[in-house]
Amino acid sequence: MNDINSPVRLYITLTSPYARLARIVVLEKELEDKVEQVIAKTRQVDSPYYQINPSGRVPCLILPDGTRLEESQLVCSYLDHLDSTPRFEPPAGTLGLQVRRLEAMARSLMEGVSVWIREGFRPVDERSPGIVSHEQARAVRLIDDWESEIMNSVMQGNLNNMAQLTLITALQLEQWNPDFRWREGHPRLVEWCDRLSDRASLLKTVPVL
């Protein structure tokens, strides 16, 4: 029988921005003694990880009773409530709607840039110029929009919600893609990102190439 008081197991990789969201929540909430982090071997034929999570995706959280939670939003929500003092949960009402709206917008940026980066890692003859062009254009539109949205009160403070956490994770994907030049012409977004970038939770979870 599993001990309900034993740590939950969080399966991650050190490259996934989605896993990074969960890793940041663990550090921000000081849950290190409640969460065992395990490096998963993904995108490998017959990886033992597929017996744990058939989809092979991260993050994946295994609860003491064996329940499996997948998808970063669900995993982060569970972790946020693990100490019974949720910090990242959107509030009720109009303010909560704003948080969810901006989180969705930040997630669109992160997902698109992630696809763009994956194309760059493919062999040259397997890359899709159409996908690269599409995701690059999407990123340009979203970054232009974020230059004004970053002034929204929801985006102020120090990683107080998932909209902020998701956006900075997306912006810091710049280190993997030299063509993701979002800093050019977006001074408010640059100031916002640079102000938060020295937080311990971000420094300790910098993706490892």
Residue ranges and their predicted role:
Residues S148-I150, L196-L209:
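Charged/polar, low-hydrophobicity segments characteristic of intrinsically disordered regions
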Residues C76, D80, R100-E103, I143, ...:
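Non-transmembrane alpha-helical segments in soluble domains
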Residues A106-D194:
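GST-like fold's C-terminal all-alpha helical module
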Residues P86-P91, M155-N158, E184, L203-V208:
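Short, hydrophobic secondary-structure boundary micro-motifs
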Residues L27, W176, D198:
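Short polybasic/polar patches that bind polyanions
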Residues M1-P129:
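GST-like domain detector, emphasizing the conserved glutathione-binding G-site
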Residues L74, R188, S201:
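Residue-level recognition of oxygen-bearing side chains
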Residues K29, H186, R199-A200:
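Acidic-histidine catalytic/liganding microenvironments
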